[in-house]
Amino acid sequence: MNLKEVSELRRRFRMDRNAISRIYGCFVNSSREIVSYIDESMGILPQDEAEKYLNLLKKTLSGKLWKNLIDIIFSTEQVADSDEHRLLMALRDSQLKDGDIREEFYQKIINSLDLGDSNYLILLTHDSYDVPRKNKNDEMDADASDAVFSYVVCCVCPVKERKVELGFFPGDNEFHSCAGQIVAAPELGFLFPAFDDRAANIYNALFYSRKTDEIHQEVIDSVFHTTAPMSAAEQKEAFQNALSEALGDACNMELVQSIHDRLRDQIEQHKESHDPEPLELSVSDAAAILRDNGVEEEKILAFRDSCATQFGDGATLNPANLIDSSRFEVKTADATISVGPEHSYLVETRIIDGRKYLLIPADEDIEVNGFGVRVKGE
């Protein structure tokens, strides 16, 4: 799915734009026991409660592609005949109305999910979307539809204990101490099937993880029985390892600055283009950056081999997963230097009297803990 398709579905999660009739779910305690079930009609829920349910489910379609939103791809064999795909199709085709199917799905989540000692809420809903056609100007015609996109959305929300506070009890006309439990934003969730080319793709699902470095592979294994792509944090670490292992001493400050600047430029240009498809970087593209910086062909070949080992043959990466385009940071054991990414060139490395130094020009005013200071010898 691309950004436009995700955004199109996100807009469904408003009171006046969806065909959601019921919200299903269950509340699970830290001992993996179901405490209570949810089976609520959207038509009779107070509007503020209905909107809160919709907002929680909509979060499952938020974040960045390839970071928070990850494509789950089923094999042809799984789609043809597998328990995991059959269950997901049954959830969708029954519109979640079959309680036994819902229970089987809940148990898959409960038996696999690791949220520590947290209680949590599993939410499920089904929607049918009359997909409007687009005219010659790529504008949607709300009155024309050729297909209905039937899909389910699931999210898992931690339920957190609220600290004890004083509260007013109208029945007693008094204040008493009170506590409660609050449903937090979803930790994970998914959409099935995927909405590719504005149509159902039963070979894919879209998985959501709030944390980009912890995508809950245990749930992906249980529900989808497949291996998810590397998380953003894993991609970054693997890319850094491939560079440092292959380049050795050639992996210096100037080279890393150049790589950061080139990737940042690609990210900025992609944003300006408003291209809904995720930005991709091939290993050949990364190798070309090294070549432009004078890296020896032998080391470039070693880098390509390392990438093949880390990511697999023919892998494509998202530059936004490899660098933080909003800053340029240099760390030593005792200090951290952070500069605006457009000024990364200001940071230099020097060896003076046998010691390594980081140098930054100080042509403008200098502040230390908010105090303006001067340089000795000015």
Regions found by a protein language model. Give the residues of each.
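Long, hydrophobic alpha/beta structural blocks
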Residues: R14-R17, S21-D324
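Soluble regions of membrane-associated proteins that transit the secretory/organelle pathway
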Residues: L3-V6
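C-terminal, beta-strand-rich globular interaction domains
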Residues: E277, A286-E378
